[in-house]
């Protein structure tokens, strides 16, 4: 089976001015993926007897263009081969023994260059580099069991990058943490990354549901760089996260961007660790129009201390205080084949000191408002 998939997103911000100027941040992401799927396992071949459960082999080619207005464009392209197994109606295994991506930084601006000249970690994360990776993902989904009133979905994934190439270099006498290792004249990333997510859909009554979600992730880089590739790091905020706050506007940790420290003043904030919790009550309004109220919480953190981002490292004693919190309400129009969603987020707590006492520390109510138009449910 041959398939083509297009995806895109556009972000515009009416607040969060960068440096007091009147210009806004307008960013977009575009992606194209082509797939070729065979309804059996290839390489290696098994016995002629067919498996007693669905299995497939998929080859992919993909390209993703990320545009951060006023700063840079990042093109990530590559391919992979993966095996899919579904031994039961509720369990799904995905094994990707080969995935190779190349990150190409394009069209940097003078403003961006001035930032990276003094921020080497940021420059390292956005350098041209290969990401040779392998991945395993397990997914459990009991929604096919229609006799169950409530449904559970959870997924765990682990990715390792650079292990095979590092082994080859080790045979050539290179040290494990040596930083000049290359592939085709460009550095390659070395990291291990894990994510876990669980969702529970509890039916309250006629078309009324209470849906909960927990998500956690970690990435640790080593070898060629102590900073992970930019597009592999975690971020928080936006239409599918903490909806009271703009995407990539929270964290890491208690770090606060101010006029005296503008090395990260381009608003993109990323981290090595992530925790997020969401609770949403969904209910019918009229016909295909549905409503929702929600509560979102979470943050990102750094594993290693970064003097340019004080307060960004995870400290267990302040974990709860580090969690940003927002609430809000939304409308969903269900067309069966697609769901059109509009959410309004309301900020309740920021993890850094805003100068306002008490748990509700949003300086101005309007500053804690987020508006999101999206396709599909957030989780």
Identify what each model region corresponds to.
Residues 1, 12, 92-283, 293-316:
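C-terminal outer-membrane beta-barrel translocator/porin domains of Gram-negative envelope proteins
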Residues 1-155, 243-244, 255, 339, ...:
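Gram-negative/organellar outer-membrane beta-barrel architecture
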Residues 10-12, 18-23, 39, 307-335, ...:
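Strand-loop-strand
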Residues 42, 87-89, 204-208, 285-287, ...:
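Short coil turns and loop connectors of transmembrane beta-barrels in diderm outer membranes
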Residues 78, 131, 238, 324-330:
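Glycine-centered small-residue hotspots that permit tight backbone geometry or close packing
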Residues 275-283, 297, 324-335, 373-375:
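Conserved C-terminal beta-signal and adjacent last beta-strands/turns
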Residues 290:
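Conserved catalytic motifs of the protein kinase core domain
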Residues 298, 303, 328, 332, ...:
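Flexible, small/polar- and glycine-enriched "cap/hinge" segments at structural transition points
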């Amino acid at each position: 089976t041959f398939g083509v998939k297009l995806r895109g997103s556009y972000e515009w911000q009416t607040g969060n001015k960068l440096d007091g100027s009147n210009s806004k941040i307008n960013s977009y992401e575009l992606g194209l993926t082509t797939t070729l799927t065979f309804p059996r396992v290839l390489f290696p071949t098994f016995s002629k007897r067919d498996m007693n459960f669905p299995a497939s082999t998929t080859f992919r080619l993909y390209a993703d263009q990320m545009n951060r207005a006023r700063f840079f464009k990042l093109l990530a392209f590559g391919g992979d081969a993966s095996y899919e197994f579904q031994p039961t109606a509720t369990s799904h295994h995905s094994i990707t023994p080969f995935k190779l991506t190349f990150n190409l930084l394009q069209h940097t601006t003078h403003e961006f260059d001035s930032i990276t000249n003094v921020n080497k970690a940021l420059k390292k994360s956005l350098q041209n580099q290969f990401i040779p990776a392998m991945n395993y993902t397990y997914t459990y989904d009991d929604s096919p069991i229609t006799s169950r009133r409530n449904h559970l979905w959870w997924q765990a994934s682990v990715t390792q990058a650079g292990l095979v190439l590092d082994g080859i270099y080790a045979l050539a006498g290179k040290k494990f943490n040596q930083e000049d290792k290359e592939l085709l004249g460009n550095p390659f990333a070395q990291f291990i990354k894990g994510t876990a997510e669980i969702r529970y859909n509890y039916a309250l009554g006629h078309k009324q549901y209470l849906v909960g979600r927990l998500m956690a992730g970690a990435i640790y880089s080593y070898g060629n760089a102590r900073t992970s590739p930019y597009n592999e790091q975690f971020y928080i905020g936006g239409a599918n996260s903490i909806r009271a706050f703009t995407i990539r506007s929270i964290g890491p940790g208690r770090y606060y961007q101010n006029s005296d420290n503008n090395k990260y003043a381009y608003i993109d904030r990323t981290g090595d660790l992530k925790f997020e919790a969401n609770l949403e009550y969904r209910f019918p309004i009229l016909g295909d129009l549905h409503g929702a109220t929600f509560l979102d919480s979470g943050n990102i953190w750094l594993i290693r201390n970064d003097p340019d981002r004080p307060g960004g490292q995870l400290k267990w004693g302040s974990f709860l205080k580090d969690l940003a919190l927002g609430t809000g309400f939304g409308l969903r129009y269900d067309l069966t084949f697609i769901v059109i969603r509009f959410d309004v987020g309301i900020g309740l707590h920021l993890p850094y000191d805003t100068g306002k006492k008490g748990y509700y520390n949003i300086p101005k109510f309007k500053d804690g408002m987020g508006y999101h138009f999206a396709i599909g449910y957030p989780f």
